Amino acid sequence: MDAVEFLKRIEKIDRIIENKIAELEHFRDLTQKVTASYGGDRVQASMSQQKMADAVGRCVDIEREIADAVETLQHDRREIMDVIEQLDARQYDLLFKIYVERLPLIDAAAACGMEYRTAIRTKNAAIDNVQRIIDKNVT
């Protein structure tokens, strides 16, 4: 696996979780808007109840998907942390800020007390080292 792709897994899973949460909020809003009609046509009331049941069922499914994604995120985060913790302190700190905290490189450089050019070199060296670690663990 490519080192950058390996490190970006956290961001992808974070985004999946964020999107699932937004979807869950949408269906929760829907369940609050769908109400049974108490007067008039009985068919209309049962249709509303069915819509409510479908929306509630979808909420339960999405909550389960979120729980699964969080579990995957925790596993991947631990795996990535185990790899980058093997780097020297500067490389570790920079990659943590870029891939875990999702800071832009310029902000990560400032947070690490590095000039931008130094951060670029440090990041490239760190990614090379991550690739070596990944390759070593695969074989």
Residue ranges: model-predicted function:
Residues 113-135:
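DNA-recognition helix of helix-turn-helix
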